[in-house]
Structures are given as C-alpha cells and as structure tokens.
Regions:
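Cell-wall glycan-active module
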Residues: 1, 6, 10, 15-148, ...
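Extracytoplasmic ligand-binding site segments that recognize negatively charged/polar headgroups
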Residues: 170-184
Length: 248
C-alpha cells in the first residue's frame, strides 16, 4: 500500500513539473499576475483535454477575410444564409427591435453580424477556446503575446462563472458564442440584456445586445445613417472584425 501511494505521488509530482515547464503556462501565469489562484490555473493546464492543434496555424495562413471579394461573397452572401437571416429576423423581431431601440443600432446590421459570425447559431464551435489560444501560444510566435492575453482573460471568465476550461468551444482564433467574441471583448462588451444576472454567449438576448453594445462603444453613433467607408458605422463594424470584406 505504501509503495502504491509512493508511485502515485511520484507520478503526480512529475506531471506537475511538466506543467511548470509549459511555455504557455508560464506566460499566462505571469500575465495573470496573481489575479487567479495558482491552483486553478495549474488545473486548467493539466486538464486531460488540453491539446495543441497543428491545423490552427494553417487556418490562419488562409483566412476567409483575405479571400477576393468574389470568393468571400460566395461563402457568406448566398440564398440559404439570406433565408436563414429573414427567418431569424421574423422569429426574433420583438427582441431585435428592443435591442436596436436601446442602442440606436440598425437592426439589420445586428442580424447580419449574427449571421456572418455563427450562421444564426449553427456554426460557432470548432475547437475548445482554451486549446485554440494554447495552440497559438505554442505554434505562432507572432500571435503568442496576443493569445497569452486572451487565454488569461478566458481563464478569468471561467473562474468567475465556475466553468470547465475545456467546456466552451469556439473558432480557430479563440472567439466564442453566437457573436464570436474573443475573451477580452466578451468581458469588456458583453451585456446581460435579459437581466437574469449572467452574461451568456449562447443566449440571443445577451448576444444581440452585446453586438449592439460593442458597435456603440466602438464609435457607432446612435441612429446613425452614415454608411460611407469613412463613416462611423463602417469604422465600428471594422472594429468588430478588421477586414474590409467583412464590412462590405
């Protein structure tokens, strides 16, 4: 029995040492600077689901937004998505109108962003958010600093809402929810629109409210009608996704 306990201790100690040597763990722990219990952070990095996805770096090399407009348009501006948008608008008209009225944002812009980001909730999860950011820290030196900050923000969110750090899925970039917010944007711009005490990335009231709030706080003037490239609407949408194809 004593030998078994000794073996278990040695295995646990060895695994703990491996985590301590993990570059991503070191960077995130330093970024957090004591904001979270070290035990929680170590548990997140020792989760059995932690994995580096090599295909993520490949996806960044060929982003949709860098495609020619004609190719980009074929992906997002097609009959099936337009029909889905019309149906979503009809089914959620009261909510959409309420969000639009509160924030002074064009309702069709709110709906369109929801459509492009997750196809109205159909597509929103490819990798765990943790693994997407973890992979970037390890495999993409140019994105390592950014991914470190975002993973630190994600861990704060998981800790405050008592979530399993592998529970939330997202894009290869680490964005999550129906509005595809990166962690720092979610903690900064998300709202509890339905007043249930929780900001939920998969609840349409909160998602649509958060999209509108993001636009307003990034320069969208209330009830603006300036759709020009130099106008406030264009700039606010560009802030949501830094790509001209996205805004067009």
């Amino acid at each position: 029995m004593k030998n078994l306990i000794k073996i278990i201790f040695l295995i646990t100690f060895s695994f703990s040492e491996e985590i301590d040597e993990d570059l991503a763990y070191q960077k995130v722990l330093e970024k957090l600077d004591g904001a979270l219990p070290k035990s929680f952070v170590k548990k997140a990095f020792s989760h059995e689901g932690v994995k580096i996805h090599k295909e993520i770096a490949e996806r960044f090399a060929k982003p949709y937004e860098k495609k020619a407009w004609s190719d980009y348009r074929k992906i997002f501006v097609k009959e099936s998505r337009i029909s889905a948008g019309a149906k979503f608008y009809k089914n959620n008209l009261k909510l959409i109108s309420s969000v639009s009225e509160k924030y002074g944002v064009d309702p069709f812009i709110i709906v369109t962003i929801a459509g492009v980001e997750s196809n109205y909730g159909v597509h929103h999860s490819q990798f765990s958010v943790f693994n997407a950011l973890y992979s970037q820290i390890h495999d993409m030196p140019r994105r390592s600093k950014w991914a470190t900050r975002e993973l630190a923000e994600f861990l704060k969110y998981c800790f405050s809402d008592k979530l399993d750090t592998q529970e939330i899925g997202g894009s290869y970039a680490g964005a999550f929810g129906f509005g595809q917010f990166i962690p720092s944007s979610f903690t900064t711009y998300s709202v509890d629109f339905n007043d249930n005490g929780i900001r939920e990335p998969y609840s349409w009231p909160d998602v649509l409210g958060s999209i509108a709030n993001y636009l307003r706080l990034n320069g969208y003037s209330s009830n603006s009608e300036d759709y020009s490239k130099k106008g406030d609407i264009y700039k606010a949408i560009y802030a949501y996704n830094h790509a001209d194809n996205y805004v067009m």
